[in-house]
């Protein structure tokens, strides 16, 4: 076992994902999820030594109780594992314009994360709680904590990509611009694609599609992000599990003025009640949509809108590739497993030279990477993402 393992923490508003990883080879020694915070059924599930475990955290438990359980119960049984933790990596959803790369966490960095709260009001406060509680639980690692930002990879976007056509003062005075998300995933799969294609990263032109409950597409030219589908917040862009993605902004005024909805209700509608859930009126789960595509009108409707939007984004990003596209990459829970989403979306891009190989597409699921197009087609591939490994590697590198 390496003496330089990294504890990776991803703190959400009502959950905490964690893993202990060897940054050199990606081996996981512990992984788990604490969920249902502040509810009677608060619990923690984890996997260690190939065994799955679950425990109740107690009614109303949250980040503090979860981290205490990890330290005082799980790791107490494995002191040799605890002693190997040399750094802690924190996933941070929004770094604003301040953070263009991962950084060691200082009081100044914490202020920067606080300043970006308006752009990630659910996520950033939870990340700050996670940092505070981790400092208490691991006092000897206070100077060995690293923040890895979902927005950092997109900070190479040019002004024409990140500016909205709003009064320029809103950008200058209030930092209202496009930031993107899922940057760690887009970074990872683009680097894996460079290895797969045997190309230097700085010569790589790819379009990466991170499709999960949230989803985004990025245009990567010469290894750098030049555009991405999410905007000021993760609400812009693709159809998602419960998020609408792109809409006519005037719909907001219509919902308020004509239907009498409050701003809070509209926010909830667009972020929690739209997307696949809104289109099916049944579920946000893409597996339902795929399984029932041929037999249920709601599933077909949702799938068709989802793939139409995805194909539009991929097609538009082809215009940014400076004359050469090396591959389209699918990743994330849907991108890695939903063969139908990939096939229906790529069929719409036949003009660009894409032809799906049905069997290859079916084979590239459940954690398997691979080409999903025919030998005569422009290339599309599936690459499973590993954001935790990127976070672990950055934490290890910056605290060495």
UniProtKB/Swiss-Prot annotation:
Pfam families: Acetate_kinase. CDD domains: ASKHA_NBD_AcK_PK. It catalyses: acetate + ATP = acetyl phosphate + ADP. Mg(2+). Can also accept Mn(2+). SUPFAM superfamilies: Actin-like ATPase domain (SSF53067). It comes from the Bacteria. GO terms for cellular component: cytosol. The active site is at 150 (proton donor/acceptor). Catalyzes the formation of acetyl phosphate from acetate and ATP. Can also catalyze the reverse reaction. NCBIfam families: ackA. Belongs to the acetokinase family. This is Acetate kinase.
